[in-house]
Amino acid sequence: QSPINIVSYDAKFLRRLPKLKFKPHMEKLKTEVTNHQNRAPEFEPEDGENLYVKLNNLVDGHYKFHNLHVHNGRTRRKGSEHSVNGHFTPMEAHLVFHHDEQTHFEPTRTKLGGAFPGHNDFVVVGVFLEVGDDGFGDEPDDEECKHILKGHHPDNNENGNGDNGNNGYNGDNGNNGDNGNNGYNGDNGNNGVNGNNGYNGDNGNNGDNGNNGYNGDNGNNGDNGNNGENGNNGENGNNGENGHKHGCRVKKAKHLSRILECAYRNDKVREFKKVGEEEGLDVHLTPEMPLPPLKYRHYYTYEGSLTTPPCTESVLWVVQKCHVQVSRRVLHALRNVEGY
């Protein structure tokens, strides 16, 4: 039964697990906000919106985007549903995908050692959300919220322009970084913070300050390589997991934060009282918004259940190792939604 406490040192590393992707990539979805069983507002795609999760070799069949919702708890220290080694975060985002019965592909439940009878009705992607104050700007005013809730986007998003460089400190695909030419956080940038081959280069062999960095997807000594979490140089060693926030860059989800702030502050959403109530806010989302950048989508996967009634036990969970940060205002706004 989900959720669970994930014990990282008991997890088995499998190199053949696929990267988490979506089809079509970076598709903007029109969504409306509904009452998630008096637990959390959820963003559901409008009719005709088709987006599928891609996890080749892990799940067969077509799993269509069903909703995005965020959970939080009574305290900031214990808000996420899942935990890792007993540690929680203030919130947890869930991207829910349901088997598309309109397709001709019958899903099979794929065990890590091969397929077995039965199938998963759902694939749920879980993301640990941290909260922060820096870098999120002033609280959006009513005029900005009105603009956002009509499906418009701010000028600078995760693929836009950053602090001081031409293509952005946090531009997921930007080449140029915070103050320099070759990009601290460019997904495809060749050169990183201190080295020739880049802290965040997808294929860079060298890490932040050392020879064998964690974050080169194809680097020699990454998180799951020769000197990984349980290897000779362990979690706190030169080549271990904790070189930079557990081997991850914590993405500031600025655009998502403003969308959630505005949606949760909306009068009708705040006054949800009945299961099934909905407010037709024309919010445009992409599933990438609450996720870490592509190269940081390392994950734990297990078979469990939905965490809300009917608690169906046919769910493939894909829980991201790397965290994402949203504004503290999101947490406060979500807690003010009536009935939650």
Curated annotation (Swiss-Prot):
Residues 144-156 have a biased composition (Basic and acidic residues). CDD domains: alpha_CA. Its cofactor is Zn(2+). Residues 1-340 form the Alpha-carbonic anhydrase domain. Residues 162-242 are annotated as: 27 X 3 AA approximate tandem repeats of G-X-N. Acts as a negative regulator for calcification in the shells of mollusks. May function both as a calcium concentrator and as a carbonic anhydrase required for production of carbonate ions, which are assembled to CaCO(3) at mineralization sites. Is important for shell formation in both the calcitic prismatic layer and the aragonitic nacreous layer. Shows inhibitory activity of crystal formation when present in free state but, when attached to the insoluble matrix, may regulate the form and size of aragonite crystal. This is Nacrein-like protein C1. It comes from Crassostrea nippona. The lineage of its organism: Eukaryota, Metazoa, Spiralia, Lophotrochozoa, Mollusca.
